[in-house]
Each structure stands twice: as C-alpha cells, then as structure tokens.
Amino acid sequence: MNADRSAGPTPASSPTPARRALLRAGLTGAAALGTGVALAAAPASAAPVSPRPAAAGTAYGRRRPSTPAEALRELAAGNRRWRTFREQHPDEAPAVRQSLTSGQHPFAVVLGCIDSRVPPELVFDQGLGDLFTVRSAGEVLDEAVLGSIAYGPLELDTPLIVVLGHQSCGAVTAAVEADETGKRLPAHIQYLADQIAPNIDHTKEGAARVDATIDANVRAVRARLAAEPDLAARVADGRLAIVGARYELTTQVVHRIA
C-alpha cells in the first residue's frame, strides 16, 4: 500500500470487461509505515511471507505472519499482485479447507466499507483463514462492529487492524450531501450519516470535500480504535498495529493514510 496519496479525487470509472471477468472469477473461485511507496516498511518489491511447512499456530502450509510488520508486508504484497493481475488466490486448496475445520488464525482484521467493489480478500489477494473481515457502510463503528474487530487481537492474537476506506465512498458522499442540504435520509441510513458527519472536512468544496472526508473518516475511526484500552495495551507493547488505508478504484492501489 502506498504511504501517502498525491492524486486528487477521481471519479470511479466503469470496470473493463477483463476486470469484470477477473472479479467474477475471484468471487466464484473462491505495509508498515513506508513513505511514498508501499504500505509495507519494505520496498514495493518486497516478497510476501515465504511459504514453508506448517508453522506453530497455523493449520496449513503458508506461515502465518506473526508481527504487525510481517502482516503489513503480506497485505502490501497481496495488493501488488492484485493490481498487476498476478493473483495467487492462496489458501483455497482442499487441504487448506480441511485444516481450517480445526481452527483459524487470521493475521489481520480489515474493517472496510460494504461497497461491492472493495472486497478485502480480493484486493489483498488472500484466501480462507487469512483475514477477519468486518464491513459496515463508511466503516461506521457501533458495539457489534467494535466487538467483531476486537475479537481477532484479543482472542486469537491477530497482530494487525486495517481501517480501509475507498475512493468514491457512497456512505461518505451521502453524509456530505445531507450535511450540505439538511435533507434527512431514510432512518437507518441517517444513522450512518450522523456517525460520519463529525468527520466532514468543511475546508474543501464539492468533490474535494467528499474526497477529503473519506480520508478524515478513516483517521477518526482508526483513532477511536486506538483509544480502546484493550487494543491500546497491545499497541503499546508491539503486539498490534492499527493503521488507516485507502483503496483507489481507478488504480487498485491500497495506500496508507497517515
């Protein structure tokens, strides 16, 4: 994932036939803190965690990343495979499926939006047993979402939480439009807008406001997670990292939001 984004807001373009076919195939078959390059601390060419016989804490062949840095590198490598059309679709084999009947040890929790264009397992090229995925429109938090996120680190020692926003987020767009017009949205959708509203960037106008608010919302959600005492204790002793990131629909790049 890239550390910082220099490009301004770009409307999402219609996917090409090749991309649509790839998405269908993936769905049916189925970065620590770098500067200017990938989400991982290692350079953009860094390889994913090397396969080897099953390691302690795993039930299948690929070694489970056990530190925040390893987890970030694996996500960065997976996103690189995705955006360059070199997906490996890992951890889908019959032996993996069988091994997972005895337990799971995902190496990252990804809190993402419900948007159908941003499925975490695909954009990070991961497979069964690799990720806890928690999805709510605009990455909005409530008690159920918080509990779902905390389960990985607190119960299974998952070393990484990623708050993943994305370009052209409909929930953020709706929240900004409701704020500007004063129009109330249907009941449950209004709740989402109310949660996003404090993060609206009023220093920008038009599409730039939506774009900036997408990033501001990710930062706010990440900060709230980092303030949770049980999670903060794990961050403090190095067992956990909580990072914000953003997926660009036009380039398929995931980059870090500082």
Model-derived features: where do they sit?
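Accessory alpha-helical/coil subdomains and C-terminal extensions
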Residues: 243, 247-258
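Short beta-strand segments
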Residues: 111-113, 135, 162-166, 243-246
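Conserved beta-strand-loop surface patch within small alpha/beta domains used
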Residues: 88-146
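C-terminal segment of N-terminal export signals and the immediately downstream linker at the start
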Residues: 39-82, 88, 92
